[in-house]
C-alpha cells in the first residue's frame, strides 16, 4: 500500500509551505494556463486585426453608401417619401443620390413626417414612368454639375506631382481676388458648387479643385488618403496656378477634410504670402478627436481605436494600413500648432454636426482669438449649413470678407 501511494505521488510538486500537489492538479493548472494563453493570444490577435481594418477604413477612399430608403414616389404631386434619419428630417434644400432612371435628384422642404418616414417636395421633375431603386444617399451637395449654376466656367487641368488634377474655373469681375474650393473626404468637387454663386456675386473668381485619390484627380502609388499631409500639395499647385493667372489675394475654403487640407496648406505652402485667409466649413481640426468620436458612435472599443491611430502614425505598420508611410498625426493636429498659424480664419460649424464634432473648432477660437472667428450653427448637420440656412451662411462669409478687406472694389 505504501508502494502504491508512492507511485501515485510520483511527479508531485511541493508548494512553498511544504504541502504536496498531485500530478493531476499540476496538469490541470498547466492546461488552464495553456487555454488562457491561447485565449489571450486570440484576443490580442483580434484587437490587432480590428485596429488594422479600422486604420485602413480611415484612409481608404470609399464609394458613397446608401443611408436612406425611398418609401414612396408621387410623380403627380412631385413628392418623395424617405425613411426617417437625422439628415432626412432637416429643413432646407438637399440632394439625393439614386439608382434607376435618375442618378441624382434635388429635394425641397419637408411636407410631413412621422416616426419612421419623411415626405419632401421634389425640386427635380420626375416623370410618371420613372423607376427608382429603394436604396438612396442623402446629400448636402444640391448642385451636382457646374452648368446648373448658369455661370460661365471653364474646365482646367492643374499640374501636380501626381499628375494633372481637374478643376473648374468660374471667372468673375475681379481677376486678382480668388477663392480656391477644396472638397472633403469621400466626395468630389461638386460638393463645393453651393458656394460659387456667393463668391461670384461679390466679384471673386472661384477655382474648384480636385486632389489625389478623390476619384477625379490621379491616384497616388498607394491609392489612400493621408488626411491632409500630402493632399495639400495638390492644392498648393492650384495656388500656383491661380497666381500665374493673375491672382494676388487667395482665400482657401475647405469642407470637412478639405478644411484639414487648407490648414496644412496655410502652415506649409511656399505661397503663404499670397494666401489672404481661410474659410473652413465643418472642418477637421484634430483627427484624433474625429476618429475617436466616430468610432464610439459605431461601438468600436477604445483599445481598437487607440491601436488603429498608433498604426497610422508608425512606419512599421504602413504596409498593413496601406498608407505607404507613417502619417504624422501630430503635424495634423492644428490645435497643438495653433501658434504657427498666420492667416485669418472663418469657421462655419454646427454643434449638431453629427460627424465631425465642433469641439476642436471652438478650441481653435480660444487658442487664437486674434485670427480665428467662428459662426456656430445648430440643428444643421455635417457640411449642410448652406442647405439649412443659406442666408445666414452667405451673410457670414460676406461679412467676414468685408472685415478682412477682401471684397473687390
Q: Which residues does each predicted region cover?
A:
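N-terminal targeting or regulatory segments adjacent to alpha/beta-hydrolase or S9 domains
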Residues: 2-4, 9, 13, 18-150
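Hydrolase active-site cap/lid region
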Residues: 267-327
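Catalytic histidine neighborhood in serine/cysteine hydrolases
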Residues: 365-383
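Catalytic histidine-centered segment of alpha/beta-hydrolase-like enzymes
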Residues: 380-394
